[in-house]
Each structure stands twice: as C-alpha cells, then as structure tokens.
Amino acid sequence: MAAATSTMSLIPPITQQQRWHAADSLVVLASRRHDSRRRRRCRYVVPRARLFGPAIFEASKLKVLFLGVDEEKHQHPGKLPRTYTLTHSDVTARLTLAVSHTINRAQLQGWYNKLQRDEVVAEWKKVQGHMSLHVHCHISGGHVLLDLIAGLRYYIFRKELPVVLKAFVHGDGNLFSRHPELEEATVWVYFHSNLPRFNRVECWGPLRDAGAPPEEDDAVAAAAAEEVAAEQMPAAGEWPRRCPGQCDCCFPPYSLIPWPHQHDVAAADGQPQQ
C-alpha cells in the first residue's frame, strides 16, 4: 500500500447517524462537526497512515488523461456518461486521473495494482433530475493481505478522500467551469469490503464541502461508529433512488462501476440489517 508511515493519535469520534442495511452494508450520514461533550468523555486510539502522502492536493503531481471525452466541449454528465479513475504511483508519488465514459480498466491492470487495490473510481449520476457523484474504494476482499489490514485501509482512504475529490475537480476543470453547479452535487462514498464493519456508504454532502479537509486532523473510528444505534433508514429524498420506469430525469440507466452494488440493493429494498 502506498502508505508512508503509520502513527498513533488520540482521535475523538464525530457526530453521525448510522443506518444498517441488508447485505451487510452500513449507510452513514456523517457530519464533520464534533460534539464537545462527547469529545471530553472518551477518546479512541486509532492508526493513521497516508495513502497519497500528506493530505494536501498538489496539482503538479496530477496527470490527467481524457479518453474518448472531448475536453473542450465539457458535455454535461447528466447527458453523457462521465467517470473518473484515479491511481497512484509509489515510484513517482504522482496521481493519474482518467476522465472517460467508463472506468479505464487498462489503468488497473498489472499484478501490482491488483495487489494494492488503492485505486479510486467514481461516476456521475442524475437521479430524478438531481446530480450526484458516487465514489468507490476497495477496502478488503480478493486476497488475505487486504483482509488483514482492512481497518488501516479504511482510515487511509477516508483520510485522503478530500485530496481525491480535489483531483477530480482540478483535473476536470473545464467541466466545472462550464457547469459550476456540479460542485453543489451530493457526494456518496462507497467502501467495499467483505467485512461488514467496513462495508458501508457515507454521504459526504456537497462536493464543494467534501473536497475541503476536515475541521480536525482525524478519521472516523470504527469503534465510535459502532456505538451509534441504527434506528431508521435514510429519510425520503436522502438516498438517490431512480424512477421505477423509463424516464428522462435519471441517467445513466445503469451503473458504470464494475463492482458489487449490494449497497444500492440494500437501500432500495429498505430493509435493515439483521
């Protein structure tokens, strides 16, 4: 994994609502504001590490590839499919972002990439006329090494996601210049894992805010997450649900991410985890 060092720090839990769904998935509607009373009562020791180095976006280290996408026409993703594939090089410490109509599978080939699985992929969706960005991270599953460090991988991905989102906005800058309203789109982050504890979905709010660093240098402790009782499903309108039939307000008609989508199935079924 492209982690430089691991440190230990005392990290307070964040205020959040958690909702368990079927297929061993957890939906977390997270807030970045901290409960001062809770912070005084308990603290958690959790590992911290870096996936892409310091959590500071450096445009000079980002290489952008437009594959089958006309960079100058900056067509709206609500009319033409648009995805992001972001990978990291341990050798050069550079990020490579592919902007295309589907996930750039060639970017994910090779034994090293398959071993590390530190890529981040994302797609734009229009659901009932509202745009949202769906970001996917692979935490564990596939081989035992990832399972052994699933917790560490979860913290790393979550810590570095603001950098990833900034890379999307910077790399696809012409699109956002032409359609600045996309920065108000809701960001949904999917953490894929064979371990229920880390198999979860988080709502990060508007892209403009999600790309900003947290108020404090922290990550969400899983122990704190498990403390909050899962009492109800997301309220109507929170989870982006497609229209049941063919329509013009939902696009694309199917997901462009070739990963399991048990999170979406669970939310659509509206069934809490047993």
Swiss-Prot record:
Keywords assigned: Chloroplast, Plastid, Transit peptide
Membrane-spanning intervals of the chain: none
Gene Ontology cellular component terms for the protein in this record: chloroplast
Keyword Membrane: no
Residue range covered by the transit peptide: 1-48
Cellular localization per UniProt: Plastid, Chloroplast
Keyword Transit peptide on entry: yes
Biological process terms in GO annotation: chlorophyll catabolic process
Family: Belongs to the staygreen family.
Cited function: Involved in the disassembling mechanism of the intact light-harvesting complex of photosystem II (LHCPII) in the thylakoid membranes. Required to trigger chlorophyll degradation during natural and dark-induced leaf senescence.
Name of the protein: Protein STAY-GREEN, chloroplastic
Source species: Oryza sativa subsp. indica (Rice)
